[in-house]
């Protein structure tokens, strides 16, 4: 019983202690929660103060920005207003000045009109007086000579007319001389201006190219076994290849600049590559021809761009680049055309013409020379037909005809091209007549050979002493080759004059190609 009581008391005491401990713990937690709540409240309050401060700063900045923009707009508006006000004031002042000037002009006109009326009155009086005097003279003449008044009047008028005609002729002759002298002086001034403002480079074209090689052993490889390589080179390239005792040099000779340039490039590539054989020669030749076509087009585009021209047909642009490989009387056709274009532009500008149109006509005036190796006819007709086909400006076509006297120049630009062409071609040292005669002769040789049916190509070599004719093996047999050679030789003998003899060499080669699959 006592133990139970003790246990009960212990339990009650334990419960009391537990309650007190729990209360203490709860009180401590409550205080912690309160402190945490206070801390959070302070943090929220601080954050709110920061937000409020930021908001105030933003509002202040916005107010300042608005104020700044307002001031800027106000300043700009005030500035514009002042500017417009000044403009209006100036216009008003100008109008007042013009009004005053008009008043002065009106007064001057009134005075002039009055003066004219007075002069007219004086003239009428003089006229009447003259008529009276004339009547008196006529009466005296009629009385003394027995002539009627009308007959006497005719004699006097005829005499006056003769005197007047002499005076007029003298005046006309005087002013005509002055006009001629002034025109000559002006023309000399314009030419001096043009030539002083443009100084073109000039280099005479040659008939040979020299290829430098590292050692003379390469000469043997270029010649090949029994001359096989050099014969293939000459046949494919259409040039003379001269391999002599000159150390470290091979000479390529041909009157055609284009063929000579291609031949030079092909041989240089073969020497660099080291594989010199007929198949490789043809492969390199085909590759170089494609490269030259691209280079010619690029050259034409560069020139057109440098001259500031536009809307030129691509085919004409390509032919402009091709002029680089044409020469006339030893003068490079492209260099000559560029010189004419620049000079014509300057002359046209000085005379009040269209400078760009004159440059266009100048660069195209000899465009037909790019076609003379491929088509029959003069370069004037070929160039004019080409420009008509691609709808070039009529002034350009007129300049092409006019610079060789086929037509009269119908514009300032055409006349400028004619003058520039003469300046470029006629200056000392610009052209060589002997070279041109030689080039014409070898061109005629090739044309005669190409005119025959069944001929693929023809090359004049050995300074025109030999014509190498490539026959189409499908159209010409061996017997016909002999006849072709005789026909070509007979036509050359009939149509051309030349010293010595010309060898006609007809080459027929048949290639059969098949592929193993």
Curated annotation (Swiss-Prot):
It is found in: Cell membrane. The keyword Protein biosynthesis does not apply. It is a single-pass membrane protein. Disulfide bonds: none annotated. PANTHER family: RIBONUCLEASE Y. The keyword Cell membrane applies. Residues 207-273 form the KH domain. It comes from Campylobacter jejuni subsp. jejuni serotype O:2 (strain ATCC 700819 / NCTC 11168). GO terms for cellular component: plasma membrane. Keywords: Cell membrane, Endonuclease, Hydrolase, Membrane, Nuclease, RNA-binding, Transmembrane, Transmembrane helix. This is Ribonuclease Y. Gene3D superfamilies: Hypothetical protein af1432 (1.10.3210.10), K Homology domain, type 1 (3.30.1370.10). Belongs to the RNase Y family. Endoribonuclease that initiates mRNA decay. Residues 333-426 form the HD domain. The chain crosses the membrane at residues 1-21. GO terms for molecular function: RNA binding; RNA endonuclease activity. InterPro entries: HD/PDEase_dom, HD_domain, HDIG_dom, KH_dom_type_1_sf, Ribonuclease_Y, RNase_Y_N. GO terms for biological process: mRNA catabolic process. Its EC number is 3.1.-.-. Its main location: membrane.
């Amino acid at each position: 019983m006592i133990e139970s009581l003790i246990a009960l008391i212990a339990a009650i005491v334990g419960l009391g202690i537990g309650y007190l401990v729990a209360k203490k713990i709860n009180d401590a937690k409550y205080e912690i929660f309160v402190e945490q709540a206070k801390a959070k409240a302070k943090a929220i309050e601080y954050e709110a103060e920061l937000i409020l401060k930021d908001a105030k700063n933003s509002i202040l900045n916005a107010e300042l920005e608005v104020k700044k923009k307002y001031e800027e707009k106000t300043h700009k508006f005030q500035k514009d207003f002042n500017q417009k006000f000044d403009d209006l004031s100036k216009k008003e002042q100008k109008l007042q000045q013009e009004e005053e000037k008009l008043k002065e002009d009106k007064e001057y006109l009134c005075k002039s009109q009055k003066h004219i009326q007075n002069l007219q009155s004086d003239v009428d009086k003089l006229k009447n007086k003259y008529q009276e005097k004339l009547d008196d003279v006529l009466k005296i003449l009629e009385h003394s000579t027995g002539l009627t008044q009308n007959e006497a009047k005719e004699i006097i008028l005829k005499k006056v007319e003769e005197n007047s005609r002499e005076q007029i002729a003298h005046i006309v002759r005087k002013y005509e001389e002055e006009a001629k002298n002034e025109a000559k002086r002006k023309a000399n001034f314009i030419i001096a201006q043009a030539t002083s403002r443009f100084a073109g480079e000039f280099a005479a074209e040659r008939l040979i190219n020299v290829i430098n090689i590292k050692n003379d052993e390469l000469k043997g490889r270029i010649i090949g076994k029994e001359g096989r390589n050099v014969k293939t080179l000459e046949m494919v390239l259409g040039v003379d290849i001269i391999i002599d005792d000159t150390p470290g040099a091979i000479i390529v000779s041909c009157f055609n600049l284009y063929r000579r340039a291609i031949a030079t490039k092909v041989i240089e590539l073969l020497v660099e590559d080291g594989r010199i054989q007929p198949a490789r020669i043809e492969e390199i030749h085909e590759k170089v021809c494609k490269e030259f076509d691209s280079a010619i087009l690029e050259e034409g585009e560069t020139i057109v761009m440098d001259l500031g021209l536009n809307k030129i047909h691509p085919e004409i642009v390509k032919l402009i680049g091709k002029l680089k490989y044409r020469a006339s009387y030893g003068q490079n056709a492209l260099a000559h055309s560029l010189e004419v274009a620049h000079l014509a532009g300057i002359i046209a500008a000085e005379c009040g013409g269209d400078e760009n149109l004159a440059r266009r006509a100048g660069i195209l005036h000899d465009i037909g020379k790019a076609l003379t190796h491929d088509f029959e006819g003069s370069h004037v007709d070929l160039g004019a037909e080409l420009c008509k086909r691609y709808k070039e400006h009529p002034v350009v076509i007129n300049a092409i005809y006019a610079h060789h006297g086929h037509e009269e120049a119908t514009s300032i630009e055409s006349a400028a091209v004619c003058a520039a062409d003469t300046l470029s071609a006629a200056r000392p040292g610009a052209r060589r007549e002997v070279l041109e005669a030689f080039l014409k002769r070898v061109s005629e040789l090739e044309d005669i050979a190409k005119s025959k049916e069944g001929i693929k190509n023809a090359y004049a070599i050995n300074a025109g002493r030999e014509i190498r004719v490539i026959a189409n093996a499908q159209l010409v047999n061996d017997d016909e080759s002999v006849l072709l050679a005789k026909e070509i030789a007979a036509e050359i003998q009939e149509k051309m004059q030349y010293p010595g003899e010309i060898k006609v060499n007809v080459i027929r080669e048949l290639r059969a190609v098949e592929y193993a699959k």
